[in-house]
Each structure stands twice: as C-alpha cells, then as structure tokens.
Amino acid sequence: MTAPPLVRSPEVAEATAAGRAIVALESTIITHGMPYPQNLETARRVEAEVRAAGAVPATIAVMDGAIHVGLDDARLEDLARTPDAMKLSRADMAACLAAGRTGATTVAATMICAHLAGIETFATGGIGGVHRGAETSFDISADLQELARTPVTVVAAGAKAILDLPKTLEVLETFGVPVIAFGQNDFPAFWSRASGLQAPLRMDTAAEVARAHRMRGALGLSGGQLVANPIPAEAEIPREAIVPVIEAALADATAAGIAAKAVTPYLLDRIFRLTGGRSLEANIALVLNNARLAAAIANSLVTGH
C-alpha cells in the first residue's frame, strides 16, 4: 500500500517527535470563509492562540500534490491569496492530490488528514450538518459521517446556525457521535451561545473531554467527539437578533438558485453584509475561543491530567 503524500512542517515534525500537544486547524475558513487579508490575519491569530495555550498549531491544506500538516508563513500567505482553491471533503481529496491542485480542507477532510498525521484534537469554527430542506434536497454535510468514523475530537461552536440544528443533532445521535456541550447544558448555535436545544452531554473541563476521548479508544469505538464550545458572551449575536437575518439570507439563496457546496459560502457572505460585518467579528472570536479549548484538550491528552 502506498504511503499517503503527507508533509509535516518543521514545527509540527519537531512537536510530533517530542510528543508535544498538537492542534489541527482547517483551511476552508482561509479560502472560503473570509476575504484577503482578513483571512490571513485570522489564520495567524488562531495559530498564535494555540501556541499561547501551550500547543503547536497544524493548519492543514493540500498543496503541490501533498497534504501539508502545518504551514509556514509563506505557504499560509499563498493559500490566503489562492482564489480557486478546491473545497475538499472525503469525496474529492484524492482527486485534488492526484491532479496537483490546491485544496482547502473542510472539517471532514481535516479530520482525515489529522488522523493520518497522528493528531487527535482539531479546532474549527462550526461543523457542517443537515441543511434546511434536507428532507427534499438530501443536502447533509459529510462532516457528520466523518465524526462517526474518524477518531479525532473536534472543538466547534456547535454547527453553523444556518443549518437545521434539530435534524443535525438527530443525525449525530444516529451515527453514535458524542455531542458534548462545554460548560453549559444548551447546544450552542455558532454566533449565539444558546440554540434552545439541550445537548446530549455536558463537560466542564478539558481533562474530562480528554478522558472520554481515551476511553472511546479503549472501547474500540470508531469516530470522534464533537465538543460544542459556546462563543464568548461578549462576542455573541443573540439568537433573537440573528434568526431574522438567517431567514432573510436563506430566502435570498433560494431566490438566486444557490445549491450544493455553494450554499454555505453564499449564506455566510450574505449574513456578513446583512449584519454590517458583525457576523465575521463573532466568527473570529469563536474560532479563537475554540483554539484555546482545543489546545487545553490536546495538552490533557499528552499529560494525562
């Protein structure tokens, strides 16, 4: 069997050899989530947050026919300036690698690459999930199935609030994915701390999350964990303020005939415009918050405390 084309940055290679805590970071937030140069600045800030919390960041992307686990600053800038990067999930990652194209990793693809690199913790903004109207469109993110099969603990501010959150939780339950609200009972809704939906599980410390991750491995259970970490209170957009904006953006997407992988980037851009940029500020705050928690979990996995 051919070994996967995986290249670790010097920082990640050194951390791997030394058994240090490493946090995987996705790259679609860079290529599809924000405009340049804000995307580059945010990526640097997220990496700095992981380092400040005592772990090593490993931003993951496909470039030059290889999976890069950890990007130096030049590669990070190249990616941030790439207008036509593929948005990669399980289905198209091999094709992107084989063609030598540039691709940014979604939650699903980042989990696959992190697992190949021996990284057990991953921080993102929000996972994908069941889209509204999925009962007719069947539009369900591959992120959910990946959580059921790849043993990586994913820290996110819940699922993106543009999705059908009750159905997303139902599918995660069907797939046997532990959904853990961190520090509260309510499942967070990305820009808002509360969705009005009770999370199946609650944990209050990084050590608890790390112990549960280890126990899943000991039991031979496939899949990872979703740690739903609420956005900091000072940065949130309350549910009553964001729901009408989401509804308006969804109506615009329907009228414009937006479908498939184009839906999420379109909606996020529309909501950015409708909130006067406030949604992007909240997005940055929640990603930084998730990076801090993921670093704490990664450290607990390494130290056993």
Residue ranges and their predicted role:
Residues 106, 135-173, 207-211:
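Active-site glycine-rich loop that binds ribose-phosphate moieties when present
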Residues 221-289:
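A C-terminal functional module that forms or caps the active site or interfaces directly
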